[in-house]
Amino acid sequence: MTHQTHAYHMVNPSPWPLTGALSALLMTSGLIMWFHFNSMYLLMLGLTTNTLTMYQWWRDIVRESTFQGHHTPIVQKGLRYGMILFIVSEVFFFAGFFWAFYHSSLAPTPELGGCWPPTGITPLNPMEVPLLNTSVLLASGVSITWAHHSLMEGNRKHMLQALFITISLGIYFTLLQASEYYETPFTISDGIYGSTFFMATGFHGLHVIIGSTFLIVCFVRQLKFHFTSNHHFGFEAAAWYWHFVDVVWLFLYVSIYWWGS
């Protein structure tokens, strides 16, 4: 590094992309084993490998950005483009679920009884837990914006308070969603309605868990004084992701819970 004459970060060889790919293989194979053979061993191994990979990869990136100073403005610009493209790819990912839902609901087949929701399906009341979930996520969007502005103003105390509130609301949302799943009168195997409902809301719930994990990492990093008022892309990326999760939920609520019921 002593002879480097450019601002780009030449990343050292790392095993984490390989272990990350291995964990993805183990988790997907583990899900198949769980669904078809009621065995969770492979899934647990995949989740453990994934957790260890995340911890160690994050640790390396934190070292590179803070202590080693590799995240120059031009490197941060590349990271910004990367995060934007990642969120765009997620938009298309969810677009597929919405397409499946509207394709099935706007022209219900005779097998569904020619109506939507299909005959025999009792949909959830959109004015109960789903509405509470909506208000919880909207409130978390406000609190993370408060955290971002506090960080830019150098107000450490308010930033930590706001970030803690956001994480708490994210965990509360996940618990509400879990309780809702427990009480639903239909399952993922109840035709196209059950499939689209649980796939769309379930993947959104997974994204809330991922976003909450991002924010918890940011909270720990803020406690360790890793962020400054003008150098905090790790938090900014997590905030962008959280706002994306917010917006997706609004579309889910209006489409699947309210209109679809």
Curated annotation (Swiss-Prot):
Record EC number: 7.1.1.9
Catalyses which reaction(s): 4 Fe(II)-[cytochrome c] + O2 + 8 H(+)(in) = 4 Fe(III)-[cytochrome c] + 2 H2O + 4 H(+)(out)
Disulfide cross-links: none
Compartments, as annotated in UniProt: Mitochondrion inner membrane
One GO process term, biological-process aspect: mitochondrial electron transport, cytochrome c to oxygen
Membrane topology: Multi-pass membrane protein
CDD domains for the chain: Cyt_c_Oxidase_III
Pfam families listed in its UniProt record: COX3
Entry superkingdom: Eukaryota
Subunit structure: Component of the cytochrome c oxidase (complex IV, CIV), a multisubunit enzyme composed of 14 subunits. The complex is composed of a catalytic core of 3 subunits MT-CO1, MT-CO2 and MT-CO3, encoded in the mitochondrial DNA, and 11 supernumerary subunits COX4I, COX5A, COX5B, COX6A, COX6B, COX6C, COX7A, COX7B, COX7C, COX8 and NDUFA4, which are encoded in the nuclear genome.
Family statement: Belongs to the cytochrome c oxidase subunit 3 family.
Protein name in UniProt: Cytochrome c oxidase subunit 3
Lineage of the species this protein comes from: Eukaryota, Metazoa, Chordata, Craniata, Vertebrata
